């Protein structure tokens, strides 16, 4: 009997996100200098806890920048009664900085931005559930828009991957690898200890 465990990070199964990662790694905007993720917990599939919400942003950073971060800092703000209301998480890489902004009862504008030496990629709105992003490339007058159709919230694509894994007798997902999963767990542990 074999059991397959996988994170419910439906974002990594969306074609638009896969294309975004591919184009970023292909230097569409040059060398990546910064990744900025902002997410309002109230907008993110209501009822999710902080760890589930921050996992989406951490996953995006890991997929875009890799698992070899140098340090991570969490700067949580709590209300007078001790409830979490805002956090700014920074992840330092060798030549890149990632910032994750999460708010619960404060207004945070949902956005994912990848800033490079030759331009910027922006995923507006609910970027963890995206079918669309745009790139502003140095020397080009107009934005380049990328749009991909998908149905639902990505769960069907996660289930499709699980069925393929079972059929092929694989235990590792091809969209979020073991090493990435271990890095995510390590980052969550660090953030939860400091928050």
Predicted regions and their residues:
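C-terminal helix-rich "cap/oligomerization" subdomain common to oxidoreductases
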Residues: 4, 161-195
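Short acidic, glycine-rich loop/turn motifs
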Residues: 90-95, 135-142
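Alpha-helical elements of Rossmann-like donor-binding domains used by nucleotide-donor carbohydrate transfer enzymes
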Residues: 19-23, 60, 161, 186
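Mid-domain beta-loop-alpha active-site segment that forms a flexible
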Residues: 9-18, 40-71, 158, 180
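Active-site loop of classical SDR/Rossmann-like NAD(P)-dependent oxidoreductases
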Residues: 147-160
